[in-house]
C-alpha cells in the first residue's frame, strides 16, 4: 500500500497523530500541498486546490471562482465524502474501513475506544488537543472526529461546547461508552509501593473514594492513556495511572486493581463530528442539538423553554456558557453575564413539530444555530 503524508507545517504528522501546531485557518501556509502516493491525477488536483483555497487571496481578491472550481471537483469525484444521509451514516458505522477519525489523546485513550465503536475498522488518528481534532476535520486531514461532551459523574466537557460554536462542524451522531477505570503500574510494583497516581483530572475525580483509601497523591495530566504511557516510558516504581484495560495492554503495564470508579454506572457521551450535516430522518429516534442566546428580561428563559413544552418535546440537556464577546452587561449599578444556552431535545429536524418550535424560538432569540440533528445511541459498551 502506498504511503501518504500531509505537509502543512513541520509539526503536523499524519500517521503519528496530529499535533496542535497546525497553521491557522486564516493564513495560507507555505508549500501547502497534500500528496497521496500513487493517487490519481484528479485526486492530486483536488487536494492541491483544497490546500491553497482561502476565503480571500493575499491581495484581498475574492476567491469565489476558485471556490466554484472546488465545488465542481467535489461533485465530480467519487474520492471525496458527500453530504451524508442517515442511511449512509448507518452504512459508514458498519463499514468504516476507509474512514479516518480524529480523537483527543494517545493510543489507549477512552476516546479511541469511542471512535472505534462509532466507526468500526476506522483509522483512529490521535490529536494532542480538542482544538486540533476540530481543525483536522475542517482541513480534510481526517474524515470525522469523535470527542467527549459529557460524563455521568464529572458533568460537561465545557471546552468542547465552546469549540462547537467556534468551528463550523456538524454533529452527525453520538456514542455512549461505559468507562471502567483500572489502576495500572509497572510489573513488580505492588499496591503498597505506590505513593502517587497520574491521570486526567476527571478520571481522578471519578475514582475519589478508592484513591483516598489508598492515600495516593493525585497528579493531573492531559489524558488517561498519556498517564499510562508516562508510567511505562519513565519506568516509575512509586506511581500508578488511572486508565483503561486497553492502555495496560498497549504499554505493557500490570493491572493492580479493576473497576476503581466510585460509581459503576460511569458513562461518557461522545459526539461524532463531520464537515457536512446528515439528512435527518423519522425512521428512528433522533436528537437535535442547538445553541441560542436571549435578551435579558423577566421570564425570557421560561419563554424559550416553553416553545418545547407546548409541543410535548422532551429536553434531554440544557447547558449555559458565558458569552465571550460580551461577558458583562451593566444594568443600574449591577453587572450581569450574558449567556449562550446549549439545548438537546428529542426530535428530528425532519419533524414539523421541531421546525415549528425553532421558528417560535427565533421570534425572541438574539442568536440561534442548529448544531446537528442525529440518531440517538441506545447501546452501551
Curated annotation (Swiss-Prot):
<dbReference type="InterPro" id="IPR002912">
    <property type="entry name" value="ACT_dom"/>
</dbReference>
<keyword id="KW-0934">Plastid</keyword>
<comment type="pathway">
    <text>Amino-acid biosynthesis; L-phenylalanine biosynthesis; L-phenylalanine from L-arogenate: step 1/1.</text>
</comment>
<comment type="function">
    <text>Converts the prephenate produced from the shikimate-chorismate pathway into phenylalanine. Dehydratase that uses arogenate and prephenate as substrates. Utilzes more efficiently arogenate than prephenate. Required for chloroplast division prior to ARC5, but in an ARC3- and ARC6-dependent manner, especially involved in the Z-ring formation.</text>
</comment>
<dbReference type="GO" id="GO:0009507">
    <property type="term" value="C:chloroplast"/>
</dbReference>
<feature type="compositionally biased region" description="Polar residues">
    <location>
        <begin position="18"/>
        <end position="32"/>
    </location>
</feature>
<feature type="region of interest" description="Disordered">
    <location>
        <begin position="1"/>
        <end position="32"/>
    </location>
</feature>
<feature type="domain" description="Prephenate dehydratase">
    <location>
        <begin position="100"/>
        <end position="275"/>
    </location>
</feature>
<feature type="transit peptide" description="Chloroplast">
    <location>
        <begin position="1"/>
        <end position="66"/>
    </location>
</feature>
<keyword id="KW-0028">Amino-acid biosynthesis</keyword>
<keyword id="KW-0584">Phenylalanine biosynthesis</keyword>
<dbReference type="InterPro" id="IPR045865">
    <property type="entry name" value="ACT-like_dom_sf"/>
</dbReference>
<dbReference type="InterPro" id="IPR018528">
    <property type="entry name" value="Preph_deHydtase_CS"/>
</dbReference>
<dbReference type="GO" id="GO:0009570">
    <property type="term" value="C:chloroplast stroma"/>
</dbReference>
<dbReference type="GO" id="GO:0004664">
    <property type="term" value="F:prephenate dehydratase activity"/>
</dbReference>
<dbReference type="GO" id="GO:0010319">
    <property type="term" value="C:stromule"/>
</dbReference>
<dbReference type="GO" id="GO:0047769">
    <property type="term" value="F:arogenate dehydratase activity"/>
</dbReference>
<keyword id="KW-0809">Transit peptide</keyword>
<dbReference type="GO" id="GO:0009094">
    <property type="term" value="P:L-phenylalanine biosynthetic process"/>
</dbReference>
<dbReference type="Pfam" id="PF00800">
    <property type="entry name" value="PDT"/>
</dbReference>
<feature type="domain" description="ACT">
    <location>
        <begin position="289"/>
        <end position="375"/>
    </location>
</feature>
<comment type="pathway">
    <text>Amino-acid biosynthesis; L-phenylalanine biosynthesis; phenylpyruvate from prephenate: step 1/1.</text>
</comment>
<keyword id="KW-0456">Lyase</keyword>
<protein>
    <recommendedName>
        <fullName>Arogenate dehydratase/prephenate dehydratase 2, chloroplastic</fullName>
        <ecNumber>4.2.1.51</ecNumber>
        <ecNumber>4.2.1.91</ecNumber>
    </recommendedName>
</protein>
<keyword id="KW-0057">Aromatic amino acid biosynthesis</keyword>
<dbReference type="GO" id="GO:0010020">
    <property type="term" value="P:chloroplast fission"/>
</dbReference>
<dbReference type="InterPro" id="IPR001086">
    <property type="entry name" value="Preph_deHydtase"/>
</dbReference>
<keyword id="KW-0150">Chloroplast</keyword>
Amino acid at each position: 500500500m502506498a504511503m501518504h503524508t500531509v505537509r502543512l507545517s513541520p509539526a503536523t504528522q499524519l500517521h503519528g497523530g496530529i499535533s496542535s501546531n497546525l497553521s491557522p485557518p486564516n493564513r495560507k501556509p507555505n508549500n501547502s500541498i497534500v500528496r497521496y502516493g500513487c493517487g490519481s491525477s484528479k485526486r492530486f488536483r483536488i487536494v492541491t486546490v483544497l490546500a491553497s483555497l482561502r476565503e480571500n487571496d493575499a491581495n484581498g481578491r475574492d476567491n469565489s471562482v476558485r471556490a466554484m472550481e472546488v465545488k465542481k471537483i467535489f461533485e465530480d469525484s467519487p474520492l471525496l465524502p458527500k453530504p451524508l444521509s442517515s442511511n449512509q451514516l448507518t452504512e459508514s458505522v458498519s463499514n468504516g474501513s476507509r474512514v479516518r477519525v480524529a480523537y483527543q489523546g494517545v493510543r489507549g485513550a477512552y476516546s479511541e475506544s469511542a471512535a472505534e465503536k462509532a466507526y468500526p475498522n476506522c483509522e483512529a488518528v490521535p490529536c494532542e488537543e480538542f482544538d486540533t481534532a476540530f481543525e483536522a476535520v475542517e482541513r480534510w486531514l481526517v474524515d470525522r472526529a469523535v470527542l467527549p461532551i459529557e460524563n455521568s459523574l464529572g458533568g460537561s466537557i465545557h471546552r468542547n461546547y465552546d469549540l462547537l460554536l467556534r468551528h463550523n462542524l456538524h454533529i452527525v451522531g453520538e456514542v455512549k461508552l461505559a468507562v471502567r477505570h483500572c489502576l495500572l503500574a509497572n510489573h513488580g510494583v505492588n499496591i503498597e509501593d505506590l505513593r502517587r497516581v497520574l491521570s486526567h483530572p476527571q478520571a481522578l475525580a471519578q475514582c475519589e473514594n478508592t484513591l483516598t483509601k489508598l492515600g495516593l497523591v493525585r497528579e493531573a495530566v492531559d489524558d488517561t492513556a498519556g498517564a499510562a504511557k508516562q508510567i511505562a516510558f519513565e519506568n516509575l516504581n512509586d506511581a500508578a495511572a488511572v486508565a483503561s484495560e486497553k492502555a495496560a495492554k498497549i504499554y505493557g503495564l500490570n493491572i493492580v486493581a479493576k473497576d476503581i470508579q466510585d460509581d459503576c454506572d460511569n458513562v461518557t457521551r461522545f459526539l461524532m463530528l463531520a464537515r457536512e450535516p446528515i439528512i435527518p430522518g423519522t425512521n428512528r429516534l433522533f436528537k437535535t442539538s442547538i445553541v441560542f442566546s436571549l435578551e435579558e428580561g423577566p421570564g425570557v428563559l421560561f419563554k424559550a423553554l416553553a416553545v418545547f413544552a407546548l409541543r410535548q418535546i422532551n429536553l434531554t440537556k440544557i447547558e449555559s456558557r458565558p458569552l465571550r464577546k460580551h461577558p458583562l452587561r451593566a444594568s443600574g449599578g449591577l453587572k450581569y453575564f450574558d449567556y449562550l444556552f446549549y439545548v438537546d431535545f428529542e426530535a428530528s429536524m425532519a419533524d414539523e413539530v421541531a421546525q415549528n418550535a425553532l421558528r417560535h424560538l427565533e421570534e425572541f432569540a438574539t442568536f440561534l444555530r442548529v448544531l446537528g440533528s442525529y440518531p440517538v445511541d441506545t447501546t452501551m459498551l
